[in-house]
Amino acid sequence: MMTSNSYWQRLKVAFQYVMPQIYLTQIAGWFAKQKWGKITHFVIKAFAKKYNIDMSIAQKEQFSDYASFNEFFIRPLKENARPINQNPTALCLPADGRISECGHIDDNLLLQAKGHFFSLEDLLAEDKELVETFKNGEFVTTYLSPRDYHRVHMPCDATLRKMIYVPGDLFSVNPFLAQHVPNLFARNERVICVFDTEFGTMVQILVGATITASIGTTWAGVINPPRHNEVKTWTYEGESAVKLLKGQEMGWFQLGSTVINLFQANQVRLADHLSVNEPVRMGEILAYKK
């Protein structure tokens, strides 16, 4: 017999399939960029109160300092608010949030949530070279809730070699949906960034979600919108190669989402403190060089 709790859970999942994800996201994006003075400041204040956001670490502490909700949402933090671990053999977490999942890639399968797996082929848009690169490697998935700092940083010194935009759905990526929507991260819109590092090839994926109005990178600006119906690839070779330092900002979300890191086999050992649903901060240790 179905309980009222399981009924509502099924209803929430069903709603994700039928709601107009892109239109809702476009509407949210339009509202988020409006500059409505006191109305905007009131909305920001209410949002900060609801999610218990610590404004003391923001460069601009006053709600009235933000002209739009988007400006507030990607607010930069004060210097040293997130110290970067300086151990040269360690990689750092790229974002504030919670660990959604982490661990070993079993041949080409990654754990999404208990009982749910997804493949490297699906996640990496069937890029055969990348799939082979990360078979039997390691992965970490970090979920950024609405209350978190939404700029994304580099785990280590790196050189950008490729960026891939993959169109897709815009399901919510909160932990509940991760447990109930199969192939969630591999079906959502995402931006895949491929780096050369002293820890081997590393991928950092910025995954879109419902109400995530845009994803941007520091070298290319806003990637979406506009949204495209086909995979787009940019390569960065020779003089066009982009070099980034450990802890340096590399991108942002305008509203919450997820970051997935992939590492090659036998290159890194994930930090012992990483565990599912564990709150983490950008700059803390993610992994060590093997």
From Swiss-Prot:
GO biological process entries: phosphatidylethanolamine biosynthetic process
GO molecular function, one term: phosphatidylserine decarboxylase activity
Gene name of the record: psd
Lineage per the UniProt record: Bacteria, Pseudomonadati, Pseudomonadota, Gammaproteobacteria, Pasteurellales
Location relative to the cell: Cell membrane
Keyword annotations from UniProtKB, A to Z: Cell membrane, Decarboxylase, Lipid biosynthesis, Lipid metabolism, Lyase, Membrane, Phospholipid biosynthesis, Phospholipid metabolism, Pyruvate, Zymogen
Family: Belongs to the phosphatidylserine decarboxylase family. PSD-B subfamily. Prokaryotic type I sub-subfamily.
Originating organism: Haemophilus influenzae (strain ATCC 51907 / DSM 11121 / KW20 / Rd)
Protein name: Phosphatidylserine decarboxylase proenzyme
Entry note: cofactor: Binds 1 pyruvoyl group covalently per subunit.
PANTHER family: PHOSPHATIDYLSERINE DECARBOXYLASE, PHOSPHATIDYLSERINE DECARBOXYLASE PROENZYME, MITOCHONDRIAL
EC number from the UniProt entry: 4.1.1.65
